[in-house]
């Protein structure tokens, strides 16, 4: 695709096009990182301060630049086409979608698929090999069910969903529209509910269900448990990485983002727009307010008010944690000073 066509796409997109130079209007057929890009490939630069050598050595035919990246004269001398935008990551995503179009799956049901009684399948559905769909389940239009997916009874799957190979959707789960469930994820598995008795652990039946809003994405090997009663809810637009555990009865708001190995204990409530970095733990029935950001390995055991940035274990305001972390390595010397002071009293 000619670079000029990509400029038209960016001009109609969300990246905020500022300026561009077509140079020789190169043909762009793929994308790569700056240091590995070759002829007819495109890359992007958010910050040029640490990429001096890569910029000088790149063979890319075109570059997407952040608005503060001032290297256009150098690129002109190298005959490299460029475009400056407010958000180069969005621009890169828009171009990747254009030059790497999504595979189109034909409307079909593989002969090895097993489909139960009273299953309602919408229009333009693709169902791959060895899929198992139990009775009374509904699948919305334009959905893609890859090989090996297991869908239990009484599940509702909205329109335009994609369920990747070997994921499992348990009974009574409800998926909105435009959701993506990646391989080996499990939606609606039994919550971890046991009651201690004199004879050991008594299992609490888990009769609730999981509800996913629209545009939710669940990463590979992540699990979302159903509760004993009621619902586990993940709000619209929320994105969950691989290897994340969402406990029974958890309520997650809209447009949250959770990185790998986050664990959320049963009954916790997460507001809208919350960001949980890798390995964050949220305790049982804890409330995390909207737009909270929790840094990696943060342990949240008490309620967090909205709009806070927290770090550490247990979680404290990030600025306080940074001061504590800066002083941590000084503790042995401080202990010696305190010991001397105590001895002199």
From Swiss-Prot:
Metabolic or biological pathway: Bacterial outer membrane biogenesis; LPS lipid A biosynthesis
Pfam families under this entry? Answer: Hexapep (PF00132), LpxD (PF04613)
Q: What is its EC number?
A: 2.3.1.191
Question: According to the lineage, what is the superkingdom?
Answer: Bacteria
Any single GO molecular-function term of the entry would be: structural constituent of carboxysome shell
GO CC annotation: carboxysome; membrane
Kindly give the SUPFAM superfamilies that the UniProt entry links to this protein: Trimeric LpxA-like enzymes (SSF51161)
Q: Which reaction does it catalyse?
A: a UDP-3-O-[(3R)-3-hydroxyacyl]-alpha-D-glucosamine + a (3R)-hydroxyacyl-[ACP] = a UDP-2-N,3-O-bis[(3R)-3-hydroxyacyl]-alpha-D-glucosamine + holo-[ACP] + H(+)
| Alphabetic keyword roster | Acyltransferase, Lipid A biosynthesis, Lipid biosynthesis, Lipid metabolism, Repeat, Transferase
Keyword Lipid metabolism on entry: yes
Q: Does the keyword Oxidoreductase apply?
A: no
Q: Active site: which residues? A: 248
**Its function?**
Catalyzes the N-acylation of UDP-3-O-acylglucosamine using 3-hydroxyacyl-ACP as the acyl donor. Is involved in the biosynthesis of lipid A, a phosphorylated glycolipid that anchors the lipopolysaccharide to the outer membrane of the cell.
PANTHER family linked to this entry = UDP-3-O-ACYLGLUCOSAMINE N-ACYLTRANSFERASE, UDP-3-O-ACYLGLUCOSAMINE N-ACYLTRANSFERASE 1, MITOCHONDRIAL-RELATED
- Provide the assembly information: Homotrimer.
Q: What is this protein called?
A: UDP-3-O-acylglucosamine N-acyltransferase
Question: What is the name of the gene encoding this protein?
Answer: lpxD
């Amino acid at each position: 695709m000619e670079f000029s066509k990509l400029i038209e796409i960016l001009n109609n997109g969300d990246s905020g096009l500022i300026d561009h130079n077509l140079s020789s209007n190169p043909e762009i057929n793929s994308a790569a990182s700056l240091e590995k890009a070759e002829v007819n490939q495109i890359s992007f630069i958010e910050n040029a301060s640490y990429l001096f050598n890569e910029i000088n050595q790149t063979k890319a035919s075109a570059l997407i630049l952040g608005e503060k990246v001032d290297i256009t004269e150098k690129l002109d001398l190298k005959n490299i086409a460029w475009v400056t935008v407010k958000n180069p990551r969005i621009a890169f995503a828009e171009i990747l979608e254009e030059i790497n179009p999504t595979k189109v799956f034909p409307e079909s049901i593989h002969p090895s698929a097993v489909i139960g009684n009273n299953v309602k399948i919408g229009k333009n559905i693709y169902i791959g090999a060895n899929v198992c769909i139990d009775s009374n389940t509904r699948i919305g239009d334009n959905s893609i069910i890859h090989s090996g997916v297991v869908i239990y009874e009484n599940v509702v799957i909205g329109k335009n969903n994609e369920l990747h190979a070997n994921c499992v959707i348990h009974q009574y789960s409800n998926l909105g529209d435009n959701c993506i469930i990646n391989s080996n994820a499990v939606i609606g598995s039994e919550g971890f509910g046991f009651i201690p008795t004199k004879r050991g652990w008594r299992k609490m039946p888990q009769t609730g269900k999981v509800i996913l809003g629209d545009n939710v994405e669940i990463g590979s090997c992540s699990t979302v448990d159903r509760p004993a009663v009621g619902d586990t809810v993940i709000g619209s637009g929320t994105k969950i990485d691989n290897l994340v555990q969402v406990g029974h009865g958890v309520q997650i708001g809209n447009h949250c983002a959770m990185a790998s190995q986050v664990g959320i204990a049963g009954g916790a409530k997460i507001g809208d727009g919350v960001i949980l970095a890798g390995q964050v733990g949220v305790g049982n029935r804890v409330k995390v307010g909207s737009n909270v950001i929790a840094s990696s390995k943060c342990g949240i055991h008490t309620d967090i008010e909205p709009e806070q940035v927290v770090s550490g274990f247990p979680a404290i305001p990030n600025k306080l944690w940074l001061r504590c972390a800066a002083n941590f390595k000084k503790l042995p010397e401080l202990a010696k000073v305190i010991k001397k002071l105590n001895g002199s009293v």
